[in-house]
């Protein structure tokens, strides 16, 4: 049976895992790393680089190297958070026709799910190389606090990458699965504090033994989808840029190349300061002015970094308080605290979490891999490989519709266990009203306009009647992925209208289909590119070995043989310069045949010479006296009873 893989699609890094028997296995990528940078680059010769190779060339190609795209997924261009990001990244973020935030690369506009799909394709390929078979299905994780449009966009990314997304699960829940899978059975309440590259989540999860099943029930979740390691980097970049401006008067924000170098240096310094007290940020030739080149050299202490990011760390505490309140628990009722996400390696974060929860966080969970491992466990549950685990997740935000006076009426409260269904009856606001618009909202505010609009649809042909008489039944249905279906029905006529909520923006079916096609054509191009590279390598290797053999065996070859092989070599060299695969294969065969004949003839010649020499040696041996070279051995008989 084909495997379902688990993918942690992260803001900064991504990771893929699979269940092998009863143990989850994190799969190493082609570079031998267990995590892959979530970076996609477009080169001038139309190659798409993903992961480490994209990261390596980011300094020389800043405007076409896309990182932290997850921060834009499912977001509107006018979102203040997106506007803040525009000023901080070297690539171009623009407004799509549907109002979403897209990116522009080489005069082409691309949707964030398209870029994320490239990362997912790399994860898919990593798993396929390891498993030795095609992978078609995956469980993909998202931040618990992702709204409906962000979940839809993540699902779209999976489809574009050629994956059927069997389930979208929340990152903290996945981490809890990874933690609780092999722990002793019994009831406990854990807090999963997940501070990743771009998002923060806190989930309170109860692990219990119910009828022989290991049950993971999310009691409450909260978070901030625009708070993570990237923000810590940005705070440090701002500080370094302002210090440099003080010294030189030059603003590095206007130079994409300098900004990219600054980002790399900030990330490196932040990581170093998790274990060291001080580091140097040293960037020679960062920029230049009329007076010559300028260098950036700033000493940075851990204390300084902590003062720069203190407010960011503090921002994580309020969601923790809310999650505990929603779960109806106090800090003392939490048995274990688990840290997930690379940013939790920062000592200040660990100290803050310990102070808030009053206990030291667990150190036996790998913050970079736990989420992918949990996704792989959930994948195995769905495929039937793992049988005694039940996962009960929740919807992170309340869902409802806009009613008279611009008020949001909630049908499903936040932290409701999913899947779930809720129905409520509404009526018309005016006499003889023949149509109603159902405006679907997500959020916690009373005022409808202050919440996230998920979409709207009309229910028409309602028989005219006084206001308040018609009965319109609205049903909200959330599936296990946290994705919403809404339907409305006029109880008098039985007329119904329903939609799967696609954010008022989002990608249409046609756009997704076009992107799937585009990704498939790229996959075909990549395959051809790889085949050509392998063929050229094969040709170069054969040319090298033939030239070496001709040099070593110059005296053994006839003039005709030399001429034939030299011609075959030069024709293959010429073919390799071109792009005609069939011609390279043809010339490769000619040289292979010629070199094989040469090797065969020389081997036969050497073999007959060797046999003649051996025959001569044997005849000399037989004339020697028999005693020579013979040694008498003394044997002692061992009786059976002596053996015992």
Curated annotation (Swiss-Prot):
Record-listed Phosphothreonine modification sites: 199
Organism: Legionella pneumophila subsp. pneumophila (strain Philadelphia 1 / ATCC 33152 / DSM 7513)
Gene Ontology MF terms in the entry: ATP binding; ATP-dependent protein folding chaperone; unfolded protein binding
NCBIfam families: PRK00290.1, PRK05183.1, prok_dnaK
Protein name, per record: Chaperone protein DnaK
Name of the gene this protein is made from: dnaK
Lineage top rank: taxon: Bacteria
Reported induction: By stress conditions e.g. heat shock.
Biased amino acid composition, Polar residues: 609-623
């Amino acid at each position: 049976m084909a495997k379902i893989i688990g993918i942690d699609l992260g803001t900064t890094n991504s990771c893929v895992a699979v269940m092998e028997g009863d143990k989850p296995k994190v799969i190493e990528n082609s570079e031998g790393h267990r995590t892959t940078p979530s970076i996609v680059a477009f080169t001038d010769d139309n190659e798409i680089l993903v992961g480490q190779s994209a990261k390596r060339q980011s300094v020389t190609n800043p405007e076409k190297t896309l990182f932290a795209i997850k921060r834009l997924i499912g977001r509107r261009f006018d979102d203040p958070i997106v506007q803040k990001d525009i000023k901080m990244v070297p690539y171009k973020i623009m407004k799509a026709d549907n109002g979403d935030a897209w990116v522009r690369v080489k005069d082409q506009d691309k949707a964030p799910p398209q870029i994320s799909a490239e990362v997912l394709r790399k994860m898919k390929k990593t798993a396929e190389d390891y498993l030795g078979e095609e992978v078609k299905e995956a469980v993909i994780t998202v931040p618990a606090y992702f709204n409906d449009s962000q979940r839809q966009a993540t699902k779209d990314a999976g489809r574009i990458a050629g994956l059927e997304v069997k389930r979208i699960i929340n990152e903290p829940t996945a981490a809890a699965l990874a933690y609780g899978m092999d722990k002793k059975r019994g009831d406990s309440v854990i807090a999963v504090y997940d501070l990743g590259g771009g998002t923060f989540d806190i989930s309170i999860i109860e692990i219990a033994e119910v009828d022989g099943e290991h049950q993971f029930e999310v009691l409450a979740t909260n978070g901030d989808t625009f708070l993570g390691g990237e923000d810590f980097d940005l705070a440090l970049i701002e500080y370094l840029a302002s210090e440099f401006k003080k010294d030189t008067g030059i603003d590095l924000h206007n130079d994409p190349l300098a900004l990219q170098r600054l980002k790399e240096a900030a990330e490196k310094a932040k990581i170093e300061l998790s274990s060291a007290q001080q580091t140097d940020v040293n960037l020679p030739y960062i920029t230049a002015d009329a007076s010559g080149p300028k260098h950036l050299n700033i000493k940075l202490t851990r204390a300084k970094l902590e003062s720069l990011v203190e407010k960011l760390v503090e921002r994580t505490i309020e969601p923790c308080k809310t999650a505990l309140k929603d779960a109806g628990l106090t800090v003392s009722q939490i048995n274990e605290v688990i840290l997930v996400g690379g940013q939790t390696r920062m000592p200040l974060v660990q100290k803050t979490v310990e102070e808030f929860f009053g206990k030291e966080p667990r150190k036996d969970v790998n913050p970079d891999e736990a989420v992918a491992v949990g996704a792989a466990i959930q994948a195995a549950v769905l495929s039937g490989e793992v049988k005694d685990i039940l996962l009960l997740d929740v919807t992170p935000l309340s869902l409802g519709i806009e009613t008279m006076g611009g008020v949001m009426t909630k049908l499903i409260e936040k932290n409701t266990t999913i899947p779930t269904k809720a129905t409520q009856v509404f009526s018309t606001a005016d006499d003889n009203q023949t149509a109603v618009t159902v405006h679907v909202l997500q959020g916690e505010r009373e005022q409808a306009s202050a919440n996230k609009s998920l979409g709207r649809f009309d229910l028409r042909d309602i028989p005219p009647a006084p206001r308040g008489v018609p009965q319109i039944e609205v049903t909200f249905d959330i599936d296990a992925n946290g994705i919403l279906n809404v339907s409305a029905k006029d109880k008098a006529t039985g007329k119904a209208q329903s939609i799967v909520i696609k954010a008022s923006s989002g990608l249409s079916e046609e756009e997704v289909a076009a992107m799937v096609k585009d990704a498939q054509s790229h996959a075909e191009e990549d395959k051809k590119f790889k085949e050509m590279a392998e063929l050229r390598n094969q040709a170069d290797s054969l040319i090298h070995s033939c030239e070496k053999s001709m040099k070593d065996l110059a005296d053994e070859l006839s003039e005709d043989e030399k001429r034939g092989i030299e011609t075959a070599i030069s024709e293959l060299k010429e073919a390799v310069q071109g792009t005609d695969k069939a011609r390279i294969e043809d010339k490769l065969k000619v040289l292979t045949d010629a070199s094989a004949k040469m090797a065969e003839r020389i081997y036969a010649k050497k073999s007959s010479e060797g046999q003649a020499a051996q025959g001569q040696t044997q005849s000399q041996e037989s004339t020697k006296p028999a005693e020579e070279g013979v040694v008498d051995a003394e044997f002692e008989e061992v009786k059976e009873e002596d053996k015992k």
